[in-house]
Amino acid sequence: MRRHATSGLPFRSRTQTGIDVVTTEEGDKPKMTMPEPGPGSAAAALAAFRADLPLKAPNARSLAATIENPGCTARRVLDSAGVDKVALATRIGTPLPQEQSVFAINRGNRFEADLKADDYAALIELLRQAKFEVDRVEILRLRNLYPISPRNPDIALEKRAAATRSAILGMAAGESSAPNLIDGGALRWDFGGAVARLETDGIAWRLGGRIHIIEIKSFPLVDGRGDPEKVGAAAWQAAVYVSAITDMLAEQGFDTNLVSTEVLLVCPRNTSLTPTMAPLDVARQTRSLRRLLAGRRQVGDVLAALGDDATLDTAGMSAEAAATHLADVLERLGTNYLPSCLAACPLAYHCRDRARATGNPACLGPEVRTSLAGVQSLPRVLELAVGASPGAGESDAAAMLMRAARLLRAADSSALVDAR
C-alpha cells in the first residue's frame, strides 16, 4: 500500500534546551474537497433535519459529554447533524449563560502559548522527562498550515485531518520522514453513522515506541492531582481521540496497540502557569466507549423512525410556535436529563425544566435515578412509599421506599416523644 508523508518546507532551529527541532509550516498542502451529501444519504438526512440552524461540528468535548449520557438520543442526533446547540437553546428560549469566564479563557490561552513558545521548548522538556526521544524533534504545525476561519472552519479541519492521517500512517509504517509531534492535528471519526471532525492538542510519537495523545488543560494539578470532575472529563475527551486513531490504524491493517491508552495530561502546577505533566490512563473510558457505541442504533435509523416531520425546520412559524415545535422534536427523539448536563450541554436548562415538570427522578441526580430504577415519576415515588401496589419493574424501588418511609415515621415519633 502506498503512503504519502505530509510534505512541506522544513526549517531547523534549536530550543533553549539545546534540542534540534524541525518544523513544517509551509509548502505543498494536501488537497481535499468537502463531500457533498447525496440524495437519500445519511448526510442528506442529517442536513434536512438541521434545516436552517447554524452548522457546528461536534468536538471531542461535546462527544465525550454525549457518550457519558447514553440515554440521551436527542443529543447524539444533534451532534451527528452538526446542530449548534447554543442556537437551538436560544430559539427554544432557555439559553445557558456563558460557560467559561473571560479570565479563565485568557489564562488558558496564555498557558498554552507559554507551553509552545520557543519552538515548544517547555512541552519538549516535559516530554524528555517522560523518556520521549527528543534528540531531534520534527513538529508538524497544522495550526499554522491550516488556520481555522470562523466563516468556514470545516475546510481547514478537513485539510488538517488529511495531513494528520498521512502523518499517523507514516508513524505506524516507521517512515523516517514522519513527524514525532503533531500540533493541532485533526481526526475524522465515525460514531453511530455520522462523522465528527476532532481537533487534538497534540499527538506524540516514539514515546516507548507508541503514539500518545497530549491533552492540554488549564486547570491546575496540585501535588500531581487535579479536580476529579475535570480530570474525568479530560479522560473521556482523550478516549475519543484514542478511539479515533485506533480505528484509523485498524482500517489500514496496522497493530492497534501502537496507540497508547496512557494520555499525557499537561496542566499548570499548583497556582502558577508553570507546566507539569501527569499520565492519565483512559483504558477504562476507551472500553466503555466501545461498548456504548456497539449497542447504539444508527442515527439514520432513529430519524427514519420519527418520520419526515421530525426536523428542526421552523420556517414560517412565530417565535412561540417555533419554540414549541423544537421542544416537541427533542421530546420525540428522547432526552435524558442529569444534573451533570448543566456543565456539558447548552440545552440543559430546557431539559431540566421538562424533567421537573414531569416529575422525572433524574432531576435529583444519577444516584437517585439509579435507586429508583423502574419508577417513572416523583408522584409515583410518593404513592409507592405509602403502600401502593408496585407495577412491572417497580418492586425493588417500592420495597426500599416503604422501608425509608417507616424509618421516617419512627424518627418523627421519637422526636415527638422527646418534645413532650
Report residues per predicted region.
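Mg2+/Mn2+-dependent nuclease catalytic core
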Residues: 178-179, 185-295
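Metal-dependent nuclease catalytic cores that hydrolyze phosphodiester bonds in DNA/RNA
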Residues: 2-205
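C-terminal non-catalytic accessory extensions
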Residues: 356-420
